[in-house]
Amino acid sequence: MAHHDPIGLIAPNAGLAQLNERSRDIFRQIVESYLATGEPVGSRNISRLIAVPLSPASVRNVMSDLEQLGLIYAPHTSAGRLPTELGLRFFVDALMQVGDLTEPERQSIQSQLASVGKAQSVEAALEEALTRLSGLTRTAAVVLTAKSNVRLKHIEFVRLEPDKALVVLVAEDGQVENRVLTLPSGVPASALTEASNFLNARIRGRTLAEARLELETALAQSKAELDQLTQKIVAAGIASWSGGDSDDRQLIVRGHANLLEDLHAMEDLERVRLLFDDLETKREVIDLLGRAERADGVRIFIGSENKLFSLSGSSTIIAPYSDGAGHIVGVLGVIGPTRLNYARVIPMVDYAARIVSQMLGR
């Protein structure tokens, strides 16, 4: 069963803990009706759904109490009620039963990733994981991966101009990264070759982060072996790998079109337009997903609990994934309307993250 952590953004309310079974049952029916249809539900329908028979008038009294607690509200167009963000958070943390995936759902995620993982790069496998997750959950799926965790295979310096060279980094999974490097004046071809040999002897099988540490130590110990120009090239090559913050993080989004399904009104269309705008603000999305790297298990952000998606009224369900050494190297998950099927989506995100971790550990 998937584990998820309440994020503690909403102050505990003593009244919530004191809800009796009848109030919880009515509240659960309001939320489940909303998650299924997106429409407000009235007291007459609720009285037909609950386990213990109650008149619509009695249901209305309970709904009034729930409204005072801030768990539900009445939209201006309807006599029915909808859950608030606080209500959804209370439902997810206290009332919802998170189930296990069906065997076909597990197989769908696992088999697709297994076939890609054998033949292609990690990036291709992550994209396939997103496509599969997006299709199963009918949401936009996202992954944030740290490039510094890619394992290196080879480095080469290619002279472009007298004072410029291309640094070509080849990873074990086939990814190629190019950086332009400014050379010290008067660098002979032999210095570029010597720098390449020095680096290649020490980087194979290491991540960028590991390689930087190893090479900084090795460079300090090997200065007597290398002439000054070669030392400068090696040092410049190491520095070029650091890049900017955005270079060290890669954001992939799949399944935008799923967000256009099941729109109920013009305000739904406006909400999705705002969400598309939010997804374009790459830096903020990266910052949000980065928060999950410090979490144990699935994280859930509902509506305004997360500033980025507050205007579009969206929910985010994300989980970290690890490499073979157990180090967290990225985050994957889904973004969609607050009307997500949380009980179904949470275990899917959790399972996809675990399968990606297994794949990276092979």
Swiss-Prot record:
TM stretches of this protein: none
GO biological process: negative regulation of DNA-templated transcription
MF terms in GO: DNA binding
InterPro entries hit by this protein: GAF-like_dom_sf, HrcA, HrcA_C, WH-like_DNA-bd_sf, WH_DNA-bd_sf, WHTH_transcript_rep_HrcA_IDD
Family (UniProt): Belongs to the HrcA family.
Function: Negative regulator of class I heat shock genes (grpE-dnaK-dnaJ and groELS operons). Prevents heat-shock induction of these operons.
Protein name from the UniProt record: Heat-inducible transcription repressor HrcA
